[in-house]
Regions:
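Membrane-helix exit/interface motif
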Residues: 70-72
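N-terminal cysteine/histidine-rich coordination modules
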Residues: 1-13, 18-43
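Flanking helices and flexible, charged tails adjoining ferredoxin-like Fe-S electron-transfer domains
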Residues: 3, 35-36, 41-68, 84-163
């Protein structure tokens, strides 16, 4: 992978949802978190918050299932993008994504997802807790990602009752 990616540190997230607000303002001109391309999943009783956005998967299911090819990989930056002009709002990409990253914009009736705010992610810029950072893809510490994934997996087991 090349370029830059969003790195989420759930341990730093306070659940303030500032990222959702600034994303919606950047893209829509008004604060409307339901139209944000990043969502903070909250488990209030555990004090656990997880900002979720597109992972730009190596083999993105959303791209594979899109009937109009609106969902595609940008060859220059290797990001998964959605061409709003081609999107027919069928939601197959939403169903296919294991992370729930593509979202349906009920106002414009098309699927939306993180586009890194044209190279200057507003969620990163305004996250006071520094839970969301924008880093070179090659510099992601694989060991740290693995450790974080294992911690998250353990937490999910606790949340669903010890499976």
């Amino acid at each position: 992978m090349q370029g830059k990616v969003l790195m989420i540190d759930h341990e730093k997230c306070t659940g303030c949802r500032q990222c959702e607000m600034v994303c919606s303002v950047f893209h829509n001109g008004a604060s409307n978190p339901s139209r944000s391309r990043i969502k903070v999943v909250k488990w209030e009783h555990m004090g656990f918050y997880l900002p979720m956005t597109c992972q730009n998967c190596e083999k993105p299911f959303c791209v594979e299932v899109c009937p109009t090819k609106a969902c595609h990989r940008d060859s220059e930056h290797q990001r998964v993008l959605i061409d709003r002009d081609k999107c027919i709002g069928c939601k197959t990409c939403i169903i296919a994504c294991p992370f729930g990253a593509p979202l349906f914009d009920t106002v414009e009736r098309v699927t939306i997802k993180c586009d890194y705010c044209d190279g200057e992610p507003q969620c990163v810029r305004f996250c006071e807790a520094k839970a969301v950072t924008y880093v070179d893809a090659d510099k992601i510490n694989v060991g740290r990602k693995r450790d974080t994934s294992l911690k998250f997996s353990d937490l999910m087991r606790q949340l669903i009752g010890g499976y």
